[in-house]
Structure formats: structure tokens, C-alpha cells
Amino acid sequence: LWGYANVVRYGAMHVSDGGSITLVSGAPARNCLPGQVALSSVGNAVEAMMRAVAREVAPRIRINAVSPGTIDTPMFTVKGTEREALYRQMTTNNLIPRAGMADEVAQGILFVIENNFVTGTTVDVDGGWLLREP
């Protein structure tokens, strides 16, 4: 969290008027599953900090967060059918039952950067993970 806070604090001084800061949290920030306490705590703190900072830096600059759900990245080192089974298990109850792709998260980030009327909010790019059936 201190890394986020320092980057935002010092970065905001160098962002041009009308500029934007985008943070990345994660879906567990608002729905913690067993084993996700650290991830949930940090993500929630990042989103709370973003909302507080939005009030401090407006209207000169905007700040938002993007919250990815399960994303297919090289971070998951499991390969082949085992990888497919892992993603299926993690996303089967999502409204969109698949892992997202990095470019889909990038599109969410571009949205909050490019839309001048969005500030102090979190955009979920999670395939409906937060609304899934338990």
C-alpha cells in the first residue's frame, strides 16, 4: 500500500492539469474468499485511498481504479489441460464464465483515462465475478 500511496502522492504533483491517475486493485477488494485476506485488504485500501485522493486533487486531475477478476496471464504457471481446469474452476460461476484477457483489462484502464467525466470510482473488469452465485 505504501508503494501506491507514494506513487500517487509524488506523481500527482507532476500530472498535467486535466490528467489522470489509474490504480489497479482486484475483485477480492470487495469480496474476500478464504485465503485472500492480504489481497483483499490491500485492494480495499487502494480503492479507499483512491476515493479520498479524488476529493483532494479534483478538479485539476482525476484518479480511478480498475479492478480485474480472474485474468489469463503468464502469472499462472500451470500449463495445458490443468490450466484450463483451474480457470474453469475459478470462473464457472461468473456471469461470463471464463478468465479475462489482459487486453480486456487494458480497455478498462483506457476507459477511465480517456473519459473526462469519470473520477473517484472503480471499474470492475471481472466477467461478473462480484455478482456470481456462491
Q: Where in this protein do the model-derived segments appear?
A:
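A glycine/serine/threonine-rich, flexible loop-to-helix segment
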Residues: 70-93, 132-134
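Catalytic loop of short-chain dehydrogenase/reductase
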Residues: 1-6, 13, 17-58, 70-71, ...
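Rossmann-like NAD(H)/NADP(H) cofactor-binding core
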Residues: 22, 64, 121
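Conserved beta-strand segments that form the floor/walls of ligand-binding pockets within enzyme
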Residues: 23, 95, 124
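Conserved loop-to-helix N-cap of the C-terminal "lid" that shapes the substrate pocket in Rossmann-like
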Residues: 65, 84-87, 96-106
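C-terminal substrate-recognition "lid" of short-chain dehydrogenase/reductases
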Residues: 98-125, 130
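Conserved SDR Rossmann-fold cofactor-binding beta-strand/turn motif
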Residues: 62-72, 124-126
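Short-chain dehydrogenase/reductase
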Residues: 8, 46, 50-51, 106-109, ...
